[in-house]
């Protein structure tokens, strides 16, 4: 059995390079980071947790592709992935290039986890909802 780590990485948490080193040193197989381009200030969509308020971490997530590139640069074996990338909110050509570049630069260790997302307000800002 293989175990991995998923984390909402923000400007208030451990940095991508430090986290990736720690995850690999402790024998985990993978590191996955989620994606949110932004959280609209005015929202109608309830949090997926069922809580009244959205957790602060959703408002402060780092870009997973940039953070995973940092992680790739300081690790050798760690599988790196998006958990998940919100592909409906992204330009497909730019995304394909980012994914291919990250996979190449990581030595084939990138896993492209994709999904649609839950935040209707965020989707609307991208012209998707």
Regions found by a protein language model. Give the residues of each.
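Hydrophobic residues within beta-strands of alpha/beta enzymes
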Residues: 31, 80, 110-112
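N-terminal beta1-alpha1-beta2 module of alpha/beta enzyme domains
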Residues: 1-74
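Flexible, glycine-rich active-site loops centered on histidine and acidic residues
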Residues: 2-15, 44, 87-129
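Structural motif corresponding to the early beta-alpha repeats
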Residues: 65-73, 79-88
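Glycine-rich "substrate-gating" loop/helix at the edge of Rossmann-like oxidoreductase active sites
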Residues: 55-59, 85-90
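Glycine-rich, flexible loop/turn motifs
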Residues: 58-61, 74, 80, 119-126
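Acidic (Asp/Glu)-rich catalytic clusters
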Residues: 24-25, 68-77, 99, 103-110
């Amino acid at each position: 059995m293989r175990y991995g780590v998923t984390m909402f990485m923000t400007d208030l948490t451990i940095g991508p390079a430090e986290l990736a080193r720690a995850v690999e040193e402790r024998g985990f197989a993978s590191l996955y980071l989620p994606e949110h381009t932004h959280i609209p200030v005015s929202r109608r969509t309830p949090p997926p947790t069922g809580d009244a308020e959205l957790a602060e971490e959703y408002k402060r997530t780092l870009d997973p592709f940039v953070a995973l590139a940092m992680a790739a640069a300081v690790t050798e074996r760690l599988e790196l992935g998006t958990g998940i990338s919100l592909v409906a909110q992204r330009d497909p050509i730019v995304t394909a290039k980012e994914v291919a570049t990250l996979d190449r630069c990581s030595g084939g260790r990138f896993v492209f986890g994709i999904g649609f997302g839950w935040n209707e307000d965020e989707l609307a800002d991208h012209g998707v909802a």
